[in-house]
């Protein structure tokens, strides 16, 4: 992340990787927003390092503080979006997504997949072919794949 030439600076282009290393799971839109805030905040900082493609620890810290301050409303919005997506896969509101649900959505989208592919999707999300996956498992796999 840091280089020998700039040991006290981190590349802005690596902000998402830095956030993941710190235990965050940011969406691309949030990373872009944080990058913009870092760049915009520089005009107010005395002693700015002068490297436009880099950030220092203070800039990262300030960005993390603003992320944490806004976390609840952003998290609520993401949860609402994921819940809406879950309902698209669970039209009967059973609380689970089954292989049959995945097949139905694939058919609606014009996708042709083998049965083994649907089974693998359910297993990858932590479910089994008989019971499918619940909402929490759906949320977790969506976050892992960076779709939310």
Curated annotation (Swiss-Prot):
The keyword Oxidoreductase does not apply. Keywords: Calcium, Repeat. Residues 77-112, 113-148 form the EF-hand domain. The keyword Ribonucleoprotein does not apply. Gene3D superfamilies: EF-hand. GO terms for molecular function: calcium ion binding. Disulfide bonds: none annotated. It comes from the Eukaryota. GO terms for biological process: centriole replication; microtubule cytoskeleton organization. One of its GO terms (cellular component) is centrosome. This is Uncharacterized calcium-binding protein R08D7.5. The lineage of its organism: Eukaryota, Metazoa, Ecdysozoa, Nematoda, Chromadorea.
């Amino acid at each position: 992340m840091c280089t020998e030439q700039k040991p006290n600076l981190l590349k802005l282009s690596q902000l998402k990787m830095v956030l993941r290393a710190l235990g965050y799971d940011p969406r691309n839109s949030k990373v872009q927003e944080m990058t913009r805030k870092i760049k915009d905040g520089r005009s107010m900082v005395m002693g700015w390092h002068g490297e436009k493609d880099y950030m220092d620890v203070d800039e990262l810290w300030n960005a993390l503080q603003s992320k944490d301050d806004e976390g609840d409303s952003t998290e609520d919005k993401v949860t609402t979006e994921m819940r809406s997506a879950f309902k698209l896969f669970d039209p009967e509101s059973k609380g689970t997504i089954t292989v049959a649900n995945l097949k139905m959505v694939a058919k609606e989208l014009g996708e042709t997949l083998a049965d083994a592919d649907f089974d693998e999707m359910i297993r990858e999300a932590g479910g089994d072919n008989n019971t499918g996956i619940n909402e929490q498992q759906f949320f977790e796999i969506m976050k892992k794949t960076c779709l939310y």
